[in-house]
Design a protein with these regions (language model features):
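Secretory-pathway glycoprotein ectodomains that are cysteine- and/or Ser/Thr/Pro-rich
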Residues: 28, 36-301
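Beta-strand/loop-dominated core regions that host nucleotide or nucleotide-derived cofactor-binding catalytic loops
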Residues: 1-39, 199
Length: 301
């Protein structure tokens, strides 16, 4: 079944196909397609017991949205090139902030909160997924997305490499292609998240206004390249309604959050602040998928 309508506390489902036999009087549906993040951001503090660690713990608590956890995927560590300073790195070793300064600096708390808000923002964006796969037949807004090296036809996305991932060299030019596989026009947007949690709008192209994409029509942006090696996540959004540009502005930009009115716009606006709008049910006239591309250094396999 697919979601046909969403109310304040209920959702109406429509069967995707005629039932084989008689249905019981009462059915229970379990939502399994949305990936809501935790209310707080788990951060590990890899520092020895000291006044500096105590100051880091206090600053982390003061953010209001991050909590200390030994299993956190984001870690606070000693800076490699600045004695006494604190750095922020991801669990995979990616350095997210080479130095946040010393823990006793007056501005340390603000720098820490800003760096962690970027991490939380990305978690919220990734949690917009409505499908765990790009070929989900039950998706109300099916969109085929392909992020690959330049040179392929719009309808012929190259196969993934070993391990089910795509690897693209740093010097290669890349193309992002989306195709509306549904039966009605939809607005399609593509966001790119780099290894350092910076977020950029890939589609619509710079300077273009968003237009509904007709069924079976590709929309492409070519000639792009990666800035650094590592994992890039691409969030592909398909919506029955256009999304205000304000909703894509990241924290620190000028925008009117109150103008974000549709459920998807409200979720995007909240995610830009590193939080989730609890008043929005994460279902509606939109869908989202996430794909990952590994940008490899020159000479890497």
């Amino acid at each position: 079944a697919s979601i046909a309508d969403v109310g304040s506390t209920t959702a109406t489902l429509a069967l995707d196909a005629a039932p084989v036999g008689a249905l019981p009087k009462r059915l229970i549906a379990e939502q399994i397609a949305h990936f809501l993040p935790a209310d707080t951001l788990a951060v590990a503090i890899d520092l020895p017991a000291s006044p500096a660690r105590d100051a880091v713990t206090a600053a982390l608590r003061a953010t209001g949205f991050a909590v200390e956890s030994a299993t956190g995927a984001t870690r606070l560590v000693e800076a490699a090139d600045e004695p006494g300073a604190i750095a922020l790195r991801a669990d995979d070793g990616t350095l997210l902030a080479a130095s946040l300064g010393r823990a006793d600096d007056p501005g340390f708390g603000d720098r820490l909160a800003e760096a962690l808000r970027k991490v939380a923002r990305v978690q919220q964006l990734l949690a917009l997924r409505t499908s765990g796969s790009a070929d989900n037949r039950a998706d109300p807004f099916p969109v085929a997305a392909c992020i690959a090296a330049d040179g392929h036809r719009p309808t012929a996305c190259p196969p993934l490499q070993a391990g089910g991932v795509r690897r693209i060299g740093m010097r290669e030019r890349i193309t992002a292609t989306v195709i509306n596989r549904g039966t009605r026009p939809v607005y399609v947007y593509v966001l790119a998240i780099d290894p350092f949690n910076a977020v950029d709008l890939v589609l619509p192209k710079p300077g273009e206004f968003d237009q509904p994409l007709p069924p079976n029509q590709p929309y492409r942006r070519a000639g792009m390249s990666f800035d650094a090696p590592g994992a890039y996540r691409f969030v592909v959004l398909a919506s029955a309604r256009p999304i205000r540009a304000d909703a894509f502005q990241q924290a620190g930009g000028e925008r009117d959050i109150a103008a974000c009115r549709s459920p998807l716009e409200r979720l995007l606006c909240a995610s830009s602040e590193g939080r989730r709008d609890a008043g929005v049910v994460a279902v509606g006239e939109w869908s989202a998928q996430v794909s990952t591309v590994l940008a490899t250094p020159e000479g890497a396999p």
